[in-house]
């Protein structure tokens, strides 16, 4: 009772409000909310989430087809463009894991029997190649020894061997911690094989490492909500360049999936 008396005295609760004496001013909730004590989560992801972010998730459910939802979703798409420094891109927000972005790339940006160059620095590069093969494309891997990354000369030689529809890069492979020099790789691709799409797996890097999607010439960037973005798991996030969208629109392969197709 003493707490409520103090809140009433400072004008932070009001008997005439819809919630009666229990309607607490939002600033009080924001300042007083604290998540329960727990063991510190020290893994690459999901990461620790701030009290403010958790409280924001306490918002009531909204109808996804309501007028109120439209500006919220639109603002979220614009924020993705800012995070990736990609004002010309088409953002996507989909319920799912970060690796769902692999499927989105394989479904929407390849034709049957396309060749794809996969730069591998660990487990997730290997798995990306496996995903690509599942959808009927042919991955060729440039595999670096554990703890290192493919050299620029190895990448250039591989690009000259055949015509690749796309090259995939794991920006940071969680299994090894190796950081790829994405800007350097995109410069090689532009010089040696300019028609090849650049696909970047940024699940472990977006929000933590420098990325300039438009300036570097990245065609498709995939990531997730639970690492550098700093919110709970559950969202597969991605952006496609105008060139990637044109590639999608000109595909001739029959749509093989429903929920992962951009149409």
Predicted regions mapped to residue ranges:
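Active-site C-terminal subdomain of aminotransferase-like
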Residues: 48-49, 226-263
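Conserved PLP-anchoring active-site segment centered on the Schiff-base-forming lysine
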Residues: 110-126
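Conserved N-terminal alpha-helix of the aminotransferase class I/II PLP-enzyme fold
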Residues: 56-104, 123, 127-133
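Active-site phosphate-binding strand-loop segment of PLP-dependent enzymes
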Residues: 149-205, 220
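N-terminal "arm"/small-domain region of PLP-dependent enzymes with the aminotransferase-like
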Residues: 28-67
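Conserved active-site segment immediately N-terminal to the catalytic lysine
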Residues: 214-226
């Amino acid at each position: 009772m003493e707490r409520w008396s103090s809140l009433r005295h400072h004008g932070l609760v009001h008997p005439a409000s819809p919630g009666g004496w229990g309607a607490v001013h939002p600033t009080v909730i924001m300042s007083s909310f604290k998540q329960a004590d727990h063991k510190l989560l020290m893994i690459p992801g999901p990461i620790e989430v701030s009290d403010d972010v958790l409280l924001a998730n306490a918002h009531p459910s909204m109808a996804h087809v309501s007028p109120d939802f439209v500006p919220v979703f639109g603002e979220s798409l614009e924020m993705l463009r800012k995070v990736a420094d990609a004002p010309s891109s088409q953002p996507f927000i989909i319920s799912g894991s970060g690796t769902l972005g692999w499927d989105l790339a394989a479904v929407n940006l390849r034709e049957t029997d396309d060749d794809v160059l996969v730069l591998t620095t660990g487990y997730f590069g290997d798995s990306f190649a496996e995903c690509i093969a599942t959808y009927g494309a042919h991955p060729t891997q440039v595999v670096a020894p554990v703890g290192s990354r493919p050299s620029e000369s190895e990448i250039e030689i591989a690009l000259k061997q055949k015509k690749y529809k796309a090259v995939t890069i794991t920006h940071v492979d969680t299994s090894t911690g190796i950081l790829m020099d994405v800007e350097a790789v995109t410069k090689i691709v532009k010089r040696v094989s300019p028609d090849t799409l650049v696909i970047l797996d940024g699940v472990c890097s977006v929000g933590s490492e420098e990325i300039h999607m438009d300036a570097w010439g990245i065609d498709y960037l995939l990531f997730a909500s639970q690492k550098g973005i700093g919110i709970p798991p559950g969202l597969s996030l991605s952006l496609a360049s105008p060139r990637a969208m044109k590639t999608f629109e000109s595909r001739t392969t029959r749509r093989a999936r429903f929920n992962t197709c951009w149409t």
